Amino acid sequence: MALSELKASVFGQRWRRTANPPAEFFVTDRTIPERARPELTPVIQLSGADKADFGRRPLVATHNLHQSELFTDAALIDLLDHFPRQHLYALATGTDPARIENRLALHDGVSGAELLRAVKNGRLWLNVTQVDRADRRYRELIDRLYAQLTAQVPGFSPFASRGTLLISSPRANVYYHADGPASALWHIRGRKRIWIYPALDERYVQRELLEDIFAGVRHEYLPYESAYE
């Protein structure tokens, strides 16, 4: 079950995260004592070839984020209970990978436990955006992740990053798309199959569509055909 994933993005000049986001946006310190802050030191294992090719091609690496207490059911429920709901999106998906169906699900007044139960039992995914700004523990974890990458990858030194937590049902569809900003997807719990298609190959995506995505004038979703398989 692909229950939780941390999607961390590195940005260029178009995107900047303030060094000290507004204090009222953070919720962690109100309820989480210092002793409960994450002790886990992220461990990322990249081969020598992957370090040399980082940022030039898709890479697969191992990590230990699944050992963090931040991704247990109890921690996810607590996060959802205290998370600013205007930054949380619940979306129900369809069954046809060629037909994009993301229906917004209302979650006002729905507890974190109820949301997590709906994810486990349905065809739903939660897009917990800006999780690093809403909870300092996740910000600290992402900072440690990038500190590891910076130490391992020559020339890698991002000036800004942000994190999104994805909590998805085992049967939820992730539709064919292309991410604009450079992204790292850290799969944490459950099992997930991922299809990656050749970059800049116009059999799978037209260059004009990619240009529109990077220019911010169209959504990241792309037309999908079963012939791609």
Identify the residue ranges that each predicted region occupies.
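Double-stranded beta-helix
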Residues: 189-229
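Short, surface-exposed loop/turn motifs at beta-strand boundaries within globular domains
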Residues: 52-56, 121, 158-160, 169, ...
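Long, hydrophobic, well-ordered secondary-structure blocks that form the structural core
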Residues: 138-153, 157-162, 173, 187-188
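Short loop/turn motifs at secondary-structure junctions and domain boundaries
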Residues: 175-177
